[in-house]
Regions:
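Noncatalytic, solvent-exposed loop/strand surfaces
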Residues: 1-301
Length: 301
């Protein structure tokens, strides 16, 4: 894991690994988490969700944590939010049986660490655990339209904080509102203020509009996968530079939510289509719109 929490390369891994072998330390967390821990120098940052022991109380906390990298000691623990609805007034129970509101991974620029949670809470702390700013994306831009709990991780790149919200355009399970738009959000990591918000259009339908992927920076562009297509955007404005796809011809499949993020290497962008569909290797350097036979011409395999 690295500062973005979405990828990493590391050597000197243990040859054998188990509960009592190849382990330097263990740490009990205050609650469950599906987020990737990130490492910055001597610190490890991760998020967690706690639940009340009283089932009738239905209350819980969204937790931000900082651990010592070498000992596993908890250096600080902060209550980042309470409840799961915008404003912190919701119940702490999961909306479904396979969700965790501590699924997005934190990010850090070495000066502050920023935590995002599935209810829309976005909170920045100093490396010492002092709160610097907070906002709630649902409260600012409308309720999320996802069947499961939203779990995309934010991205820090060149002093900008990016978050994709690729969602349905209609309510699902009483969540969200009609005509909701998918969008990309760019913020100042120093204060959380919006620098730009750009609609990200798609012809996908229903679940296929949803994506839990992370924005990936590459060669001066932002790569975004979801809504049946892969797109490249200008980091300064959010404007779409090119569009490739689709892995869902005619957008016939309505239940192809995308979960993995794109990856780049060797002059190719790899994007994984949903539900046993192929992995596409697309040549970098695209411009304009590539679909149908034209889109396949840019596919290496």
């Amino acid at each position: 894991p690295n500062y973005n929490g979405s990828q990493g390369q590391e050597g000197a891994l243990p040859e054998k690994f188990g509960p009592d072998e190849g382990v330097r330390w263990k740490c009990s967390l205050p609650g469950s988490s599906a987020a990737t821990p990130i490492i910055d120098s001597s610190r490890v940052f991760l998020s967690s969700v706690t639940m009340s022991s009283d089932a009738d109380e239905k209350q819980g906390d969204l937790v931000a944590l900082c651990l010592d990298r070498f000992t596993g000691k908890i250096l600080w623990q902060r209550k980042a939010g309470s409840g799961y609805l915008p404003g912190g007034d919701g119940f702490s129970h999961q909306l479904d049986s396979k969700s965790n509101y501590a699924s997005p991974s934190p990010v850090t620029d070495g000066e502050r660490v920023i935590f995002f949670f599935g209810n829309g809470d976005l909170v920045a702390y100093s490396l010492k655990g002092e709160e610097e700013w907070r906002r709630n994306v649902q409260r600012d831009f409308g309720d999320f339209c996802f069947q499961w709990t939203f779990s995309s991780s934010p991205t820090l790149h060149r002093n900008r904080l990016y978050l994709p919200v690729l969602q349905r355009d209609e309510p699902v399970h009483a969540r969200g509102k009609p005509n909701a738009e998918s969008f990309l959000l760019c913020m100042d990591p120093k204060n959380g203020k919006t620098l730009w918000k750009k609609t990200r259009a798609s012809s996908a339908r229903k679940e296929s509009l949803e994506s839990f992927g992370t924005i990936i920076p590459h060669e001066g562009q932002l790569l975004v996968a979801g809504g049946d297509v892969l797109t490249g955007h200008d980091p300064k404005t959010g404007n779409e530079l090119w569009r490739w796809g689709t892995w869902n011809p005619g957008h016939k499949q309505e239940w192809w939510r995308l979960v993995p993020s794109p990856v780049v290497g060797g002059g190719r962008m790899l994007v994984c289509a949903p539900k046993k569909a192929p992995v596409y290797a697309i040549e970098t350097g695209l411009s304009g719109t590539h679909s149908g036979e034209d889109g396949l011409a840019s596919v290496s395999y």
